[in-house]
Regions:
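Helix-loop boundary and gating motifs at the non-cytosolic
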Residues: 2-56, 212-255
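C-terminal transmembrane bundle of multi-pass solute transporters/carriers
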Residues: 46, 59, 71, 239-398
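Hydrophobic core of transmembrane alpha-helices in multi-pass small-molecule transporters
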Residues: 18, 84, 95-111, 301-316
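Juxtamembrane intracellular "pre-TM" segments in multi-pass secondary transporters
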Residues: 1-7, 185-219
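Conserved MFS/SLC helix-loop-helix module at the cytosolic interface between two early adjacent transmembrane helices
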Residues: 55-92
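Helix-loop junctions on the cytosolic side of multi-pass membrane transporters
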Residues: 163, 170-196, 384-396
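C-terminal ends and interior cores of transmembrane alpha-helices
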Residues: 79-93, 97, 285-298
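Cytoplasmic helix-loop-helix junction between adjacent transmembrane helices
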Residues: 102-144
């Protein structure tokens, strides 16, 4: 691959992330569900359907990406996302929302680890893997800018034309993302997985993770921050409604969240020279504190703090991803990330169920405080158990 073709592939990847991330309904999807008479527990049940099937598909899909083609897997992932969008647009009860969640689980499983593995291997082919954090940060930055525009526009469209309109319009941008994925050039990486069977490849990746215990600490860090992030990201809309924030403002609030993601991803690589242990400890504290303050304040001012878990996760994401990818071989990247996503969903299912039950039986505010306490408990475990192990990794890196 020449310099020109490398740059072209990277920019096509950026464009793919932009159109894939241009989802007009993310700022109002829970409001659509509530308008169609779903309770918070119903919404969590839809999420559980997504999570359970993601657990089933996660590892096999990662192996498909490692053994077949990453660009085709990226394209198919968007096709299933389009099916999810269509089903939710026409859903009138929980059953179609659940079927849509099933399609979304396939989409998410196919995407998991495939996009970052494609990017890392593209850079590795040209010996530029040291720029991975920065390049991944750029991709997230551009995707987040698109999401900001989509969030604001989607809320306005929903306010003027109805809650279903943003779903229909999103399909156009998703179709363009499919075409962009198909135009990508597959990096020429030696695929050692051709020498083993499909299931042997999965087992060998699992054994690799099992034999490197210090990786556990990185994995559990991203699992806890990522699983709890979903509760702030997905159910923040319900908090906003309960503190009296009007729907048309939701797009601007989503823009704030996406702006945090964009800026965090863009500049987090500058933190690579600092102590990973101290950075991660601080970010866990920020995440837990954000949940507690959000639930305790019970006001529009409390909505400010719901963005702290997003800040913590998106600052950590490129750093943790880089640490993990340096440990995986090329043929194990997507499968390894799929194992991590599986663990994330394993944690998310009981946490989300507890969140939904507390939100329905007590209040959304109490549910957020409980999540904050859960993150606080992990902070204690991280400081006592993981801090030194993370320090060992950063010594190797520096």
């Amino acid at each position: 691959m020449t310099d020109t073709s490398l740059q072209l592939n990277i920019w096509k990847f950026y464009l793919f992330k932009v159109f894939e991330g241009f989802v007009l309904y993310y700022s109002i999807d829970k409001i659509l569900m509530e308008s169609r008479e779903l309770s918070v527990t119903d919404m969590v049940q839809v999420e559980i359907v997504f999570a359970v099937f993601l657990l089933i598909f996660e590892i096999p899909s990662g192996a498909i990406s490692d053994r077949w083609s990453r660009k085709y897997v990226l394209a198919i992932n968007v096709v299933f996302f389009m099916l999810n969008t269509f089903l939710w647009a026409i859903a009138q009860d929980i059953s179609l929302f659940m079927i849509g969640a099933f399609a979304a689980s396939i989409s998410s499983a196919l995407k998991s680890g495939t996009d970052t593995s494609f990017l890392y291997d593209t850079l590795l082919e040209f010996s530029k893997e040291e720029t991975y954090e920065k390049t991944l940060g750029n991709a997230i930055f551009y995707e987040s800018i698109a999401a900001i525009v989509a969030g604001i526009a989607g809320a306005m469209i929903a306010d003027y034309y109805g809650l279903a309109a943003p779903f229909w319009l999103t399909l156009i941008f998703s179709f363009i993302a499919v075409l962009l994925a198909l135009s990508l050039r597959e990096p020429e990486i030696q695929r050692t997985t051709e020498e083993v069977t499909y299931w042997e490849h999965i087992v060998s990746t699992g054994r690799f993770l099992w034999r490197h215990p210090f990786i556990y600490h990185l994995i559990f860090l991203t699992v806890i921050l990522g699983a709890t992030l979903n509760l702030a990201d997905e159910y923040g809309q319900l908090y906003f409604v309960r503190v009296g924030i009007p729907i048309f403002v939701f797009g601007y609030l989503a823009a704030v969240g996406n702006g945090i993601e964009a800026i965090s991803a863009k500049f987090s690589h500058k933190l690579r020279c600092y102590s990973r242990g101290k950075i991660y400890t601080f970010l866990i504290f920020v995440s837990g504190g954000g949940f507690v303050l959000t639930g305790a304040l019970k006001s529009p001012f409390g909505a400010v703090f719901i963005f702290l878990p997003l800040l913590a996760y998106y600052v950590s994401c490129p750093l943790i991803s880089s640490d993990l990818h340096r440990e995986f071989s090329s043929g194990q990247r997507a499968t390894g990330e799929s194992f991590i996503s599986l663990l994330k969903m394993t944690v998310y299912i009981p946490v989300a169920l507890g969140f939904g039950l507390i939100a329905d039986r007590v209040s959304v505010f109490s549910a957020y405080i409980t999540v904050g306490a859960f993150v606080g408990l992990y902070l204690i475990i991280f400081v006592l158990v993981s801090f030194r192990k993370i320090g060992h990794i950063e010594t190797i890196e520096s």
